[in-house]
Amino acid sequence: IAAYLFGGIICDYISIKKLIPAAMISTGALGLVMLTIPSPIIMVIIHGLFAITCLMLFFPAQTKAVRNLASVNEQGKAFGIFEGGRGISNAVYLAIAALIFGQMTIIKSESFGVRGIILFYSVMTILLGVIDIVLLKGIDDGKKGDSNDTVNLKMLTKPLKMPAVWLMIG
């Protein structure tokens, strides 16, 4: 929950051109660490770091990037195209992951298949993070960090008093 609360604030002060690639590359790197078959404590730490890289850094910056790509009158269309594209790419990734799992299970074992899936998703996430460094150069990141806005408790509690926020949460 804390990751969601602070993610939006962070992407208002740090460029999404830096946040998105950094979050993706670090998430992929954490996946590669999982391949070393770490201890249970390290696995818990890795999943905690996933919360930071994905929920606090990546998703708010991704939402801001999509929002900045469209005019005020085209927000619905932009998010619809984005979600549709994300659904299609997820289906393709899932098909590839299933193929990898099936082939690696035939070769060795189910655990070998799971390791293949982790490797696939980790490498793809790192590659896409590197590609994003180039692709995000032309996007307006809408960074507000240059202003004198300070984060205070009143700013954080204001959305909690809005019925629309609670409607979206529910």
What is the role of each PLM region?
Residues M56-S71:
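Intracellular juxtamembrane helix-capping segments at the cytosolic ends
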Residues G76-G102:
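Glycine-rich segments within core transmembrane alpha-helices of 12-TM secondary carriers
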Residues I139-L167:
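Juxtamembrane intracellular "pre-TM" segments in multi-pass secondary transporters
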Residues I1-I9:
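Central cavity-lining transmembrane alpha-helices of secondary-active solute carriers
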Residues K17-I20:
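Primarily marks hydrophobic transmembrane alpha-helices of the MFS/SLC 12-helix fold
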Residues S122-K144:
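C-terminal membrane-cytosol helix-exit motif in multi-pass small-molecule transporters
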Residues I25-S39:
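C-terminal ends and interior cores of transmembrane alpha-helices
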Residues L30, I41-L57:
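Hydrophobic core of transmembrane alpha-helices in multi-pass small-molecule transporters
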